[in-house]
């Protein structure tokens, strides 16, 4: 059975890879959708099979590329939440709350891709839940982190929360998808900070079983 530290490392690599893949899928969907406009379109429209006669890339509908990217990102994030649980950083009620909020955020980004915009209200609920949970989870995670990492997480969580509020405000200048990108970027920054923290040598060694320590002595 894999050691705890190895599972933590694997979950960290998975979340980074899945996040990058998700961003690439979104980028492909944008690049291959000439009708898409940052000021006026929502990102979710890229996942709508009826939007702008969705183009085909190598035999695959662009909407499926977009939705698959969201689902892969969510799966990687869910795996990472288990790695967070195994680490010795998030303890007590605050720590468990932080992990639970992060896990739920990842569940809802998965559901945002699973229930594409074609599904109407199911997609809307999933997407808005994700945008709401991202700042909450990052803020909760900051309560279990020290120093500048705490400050950085709080800054990106506040930025993400402001973006969430803007989703409900009439914006004559448009920028629909740009507002959506803020929590996505905040999540990416948060993931990097958390991965850096749980993969630090001291943290990883702290997760080694006590029996191994005794054997080494």
Residue ranges and their predicted role:
Residues 3-14, 55-65, 90-97, 115-126, ...:
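Membrane-interfacial loop-to-transmembrane-helix junctions in polytopic alpha-helical membrane proteins
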Residues 6-34:
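N-terminal signal-anchor transmembrane alpha helix
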Residues 14-17, 70-89:
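Transmembrane alpha-helical segments in integral membrane proteins
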Residues 31-44:
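Interfacial/capping segments of alpha-helical transmembrane domains
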Residues 48-75:
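Interfacial helix-start motif at the membrane-water boundary
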Residues 79-105:
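Cytoplasmic juxtamembrane regions at transmembrane-helix boundaries
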Residues 101-142:
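Membrane-proximal helix-loop-helix units in multi-pass membrane proteins
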Residues 139-217:
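Terminal transmembrane helical module of multi-pass membrane proteins
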